[in-house]
Regions:
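N-terminal carbohydrate-binding accessory modules
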Residues: 1-44, 65
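Substrate-binding/catalytic cleft of secreted carbohydrate-active enzymes
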Residues: 41-44, 51-167
Length: 167
């Protein structure tokens, strides 16, 4: 939860020292072995990293299990990325015909991983502009999971996001 602009986990304030993570391996390419995942976690722990954002899509389900086991916090991001479309009036976030896509991609993320205690924040997507589709998707996620904050990096102070995180 967030209270007085402070992120709390189990009622206690936490200082996030985080990193973004893409599913890519120097040897296996887009196939990341469990051994490499564990190696990554151990390196992060040595560097005092305590949180990871699964940018810009959900990760291999084994990653969430390992984060539960090793005690890494997660911001679990849905696979919404459309920055090539533009952020202004062309943003897909503003077109009603893309609302179902916004919700379905977040539904897949949240319903797949909701039982992982390592997830402390849901992320609606990345660099897709801002509009009514994100407002309605935020409401949908909050209705399904009232226990976790929801963020969207294009959401400002007057937007539907629990965490202000501008790029």
């Amino acid at each position: 939860e967030i209270k007085n602009a402070q992120l709390l986990v189990n009622g206690k304030p936490v200082l996030i020292k985080g990193a973004n993570r893409h599913e890519i391996d120097p040897d296996g390419g887009y196939v990341v072995s469990v051994e490499r995942m564990i190696q990554d976690i151990r390196i992060m722990k040595q560097l005092n990293i305590n949180a990871v954002r699964t940018c810009h899509y959900p990760d291999d389900p084994r990653w969430y299990e390992l984060c539960d086991e090793y005690g890494l916090y997660l911001t679990a991001e849905a696979n919404l990325e459309s920055h090539g479309m533009g952020y202004g009036e062309k943003s897909l976030a503003k077109f009603p015909e893309y609302l179902q896509t916004h919700i379905e991609r977040n539904e897949g993320n949240v319903k797949s991983f909701i039982n992982h205690p390592s997830i402390i924040v849901w992320s609606l997507g990345n660099e897709c502009g801002y509009g009514i589709n994100f407002e309605k998707t935020y409401d949908w996620v909050k209705a399904l999971d009232k226990t976790r904050p929801v963020q969207y990096e294009r959401g400002g102070y007057d937007s539907k996001t629990d965490i202000h995180c501008p790029m």
